[in-house]
Swiss-Prot record:
Active-site residues (renumbered): 91, 340
Record localization: Cytoplasm
Cofactor(s) the protein requires to work: [4Fe-4S] cluster
Protein name per UniProt: Probable dual-specificity RNA methyltransferase RlmN
Source organism of this protein record: Streptococcus uberis (strain ATCC BAA-854 / 0140J)
Amino acid sequence: MKPSIYSLTRDELIAWALENGQKKFRATQIWDWLYKKRVQSFEEMTNISKDFIALLNEHFCVNPLKQRIVQESADGTVKYLFELPDGMLIETVLMRQHYGHSVCVTTQVGCNIGCTFCASGLIKKQRDLNNGEITAQIMLVQKYFDERGQDERVSHVVVMGIGEPFDNYDNVMKFLRTINDDNGLAIGARHITVSTSGLAHKIREFANEGVQVNLAVSLHAPNNELRSSIMRINRSFPLEKLFAAIEYYIETTNRRVTFEYIMLNEVNDGVEQAQELADLTKKIRKLSYVNLIPYNPVSEHDQYSRSPKERVAAFYDVLKKNGVNCVVRQEHGTDIDAACGQLRSNTMKKDRQKVVAAVAD
């Protein structure tokens, strides 16, 4: 199975070209074909020699993903189900915003974090995606625009799809540098957000990277007892350890942290929990932000339901009265398989049913 050429950073592509007897400018030309002209095959690179194209084909493919399903929402949201070369399935989402087009990418096949409300964790982690497989998601969404003759581009990226990005740290960092490269897609670092469930040691490492990429933390509860009951990760990285890492990140980067807080009816959405959350974030209030997220119900997690608007409003009011910067997140794609991991899970369920039916016949 040949790797995708997207898995190489620009420096790695230059090094590979030099090792294979080519000039540096040839690597620059290839990079330009990939990320500016966005070709889907090496044969389309008209200023590259046939011998070098043959060498490229021998060692690499271009895009390793196959499109299985596309769901388009009435609000313009597009959800993709992609198949990897080994047959594994991943999701990617395009969200149309007033400020541009944002793409949510997946970083792992399955997830081992074990959040009890999340569709992503219904399938345990099978493997990490490599840098090329993550980058390919962006390239196929951009291809969606290009094929429609739309003068539009992917302007924002959120690393919030299936999997824990910091559990696949090295590949995610290579991906971030690839899409941020000024000679390629040139997606601004401040238009990119990476979300973690709270791997404290990786937050510290991320703080030392010197990148301007935004950090979001999936918090979802304001105390250890509740957070440990709905997010297994809290048993390894309790709030004291997590917030020490967050404070280090803020001190090191002087950048704001966003806290994601999914609203679960009568679980974590009471006014007393809102006050706890306000107290928890008080020390870092000037450089923190709370994103209240309406819950997309998952049939396998029927113990949870969406918080009524009245409870969300009351929670929000407590935060605002305490001076917390917060917002209720705008929903996207509510008329399709909206929850992260839901399209993949539902498709795999249907595939299994087909196999069972075929065996029964």
